[in-house]
Amino acid sequence: MAEGQVLVLDGRGHLLGRLAAIVAKQVLLGRKVVVVRCEGINISGNFYRNKLNYLAFLRKRMNTNPSRGPYDFRAPSRIFWRTVRGMLPHKTKRGQAALDRLKVFDGIPPPYDKKKRMVVPAALKVVRLKPTRKFAYLGRLAHEVGWKYQAVTATLEEKRKEKAKIHYRKKKQLMRLRKQAEKNVEKKIDKYTEVLKTHGLLV
């Protein structure tokens, strides 16, 4: 699949289950999906209850030989990946191929920091959850059950945002200069513009 057809989603502010369901459907249909900022994904319900549920889930193991599984993930990106896996027939070739089309990241690593990121309105917390309802952050939950890189991810995100601000300022300045340059030569190129319009080359 072409690079332009990769769907880059920003996980921040989305509900875990709803986003996972939409992503699962897209990868089954053959689209390549990349989900960034998984630490900003939300889970409905208060934090304490979600933490108890996840800790209960972590306690499940094979009594005779725990090394045989189940294997539990602590990073937000891997928790999201496993949620999507549960919505796919991952033990079949079709399901495995679909799972291979999904990439998940904590923070926004290169080259995705330079690409346009999309949101899914059907999975956004502000759209789907009443303002009075409680919710938890996947990043905080992951941190409290053993994820060690919350501070590192936060630091890298701050650096990325600073770089993005500088880039945006430069872009605005260039756009302003371009508009000014176009305005300066507008009268000089009027006759050429009219000729191009008559030939249908300029609208």
UniProtKB/Swiss-Prot annotation:
<feature type="modified residue" description="N6-acetyllysine">
    <location>
        <position position="191"/>
    </location>
</feature>
<feature type="modified residue" description="Phosphoserine">
    <location>
        <position position="77"/>
    </location>
</feature>
<keyword id="KW-0597">Phosphoprotein</keyword>
<comment type="function">
    <text>Associated with ribosomes but is not required for canonical ribosome function and has extra-ribosomal functions. Component of the GAIT (gamma interferon-activated inhibitor of translation) complex which mediates interferon-gamma-induced transcript-selective translation inhibition in inflammation processes. Upon interferon-gamma activation and subsequent phosphorylation dissociates from the ribosome and assembles into the GAIT complex which binds to stem loop-containing GAIT elements in the 3'-UTR of diverse inflammatory mRNAs (such as ceruplasmin) and suppresses their translation.</text>
</comment>
<dbReference type="GO" id="GO:1901194">
    <property type="term" value="P:negative regulation of formation of translation preinitiation complex"/>
</dbReference>
<dbReference type="GO" id="GO:0017148">
    <property type="term" value="P:negative regulation of translation"/>
</dbReference>
<dbReference type="GO" id="GO:0005840">
    <property type="term" value="C:ribosome"/>
</dbReference>
<keyword id="KW-0963">Cytoplasm</keyword>
<dbReference type="Pfam" id="PF00572">
    <property type="entry name" value="Ribosomal_L13"/>
</dbReference>
<dbReference type="GO" id="GO:0022625">
    <property type="term" value="C:cytosolic large ribosomal subunit"/>
</dbReference>
<dbReference type="GO" id="GO:0097452">
    <property type="term" value="C:GAIT complex"/>
</dbReference>
<dbReference type="InterPro" id="IPR023563">
    <property type="entry name" value="Ribosomal_uL13_CS"/>
</dbReference>
<keyword id="KW-0164">Citrullination</keyword>
<feature type="modified residue" description="N-acetylalanine">
    <location>
        <position position="2"/>
    </location>
</feature>
<feature type="modified residue" description="Citrulline">
    <location>
        <position position="140"/>
    </location>
</feature>
<keyword id="KW-0689">Ribosomal protein</keyword>
<feature type="modified residue" description="Citrulline">
    <location>
        <position position="59"/>
    </location>
</feature>
<keyword id="KW-0810">Translation regulation</keyword>
<protein>
    <recommendedName>
        <fullName>Large ribosomal subunit protein uL13</fullName>
    </recommendedName>
</protein>
<keyword id="KW-0007">Acetylation</keyword>
<dbReference type="InterPro" id="IPR005755">
    <property type="entry name" value="Ribosomal_uL13_euk/arc"/>
</dbReference>
<keyword id="KW-0687">Ribonucleoprotein</keyword>
<dbReference type="GO" id="GO:0003735">
    <property type="term" value="F:structural constituent of ribosome"/>
</dbReference>
<dbReference type="GO" id="GO:0003729">
    <property type="term" value="F:mRNA binding"/>
</dbReference>
<dbReference type="InterPro" id="IPR005822">
    <property type="entry name" value="Ribosomal_uL13"/>
</dbReference>
<comment type="subunit">
    <text>Component of the 60S ribosome. Component of the GAIT complex. Interacts with EIF4G1.</text>
</comment>
<comment type="similarity">
    <text>Belongs to the universal ribosomal protein uL13 family.</text>
</comment>
<dbReference type="InterPro" id="IPR036899">
    <property type="entry name" value="Ribosomal_uL13_sf"/>
</dbReference>
<dbReference type="GO" id="GO:0006412">
    <property type="term" value="P:translation"/>
</dbReference>
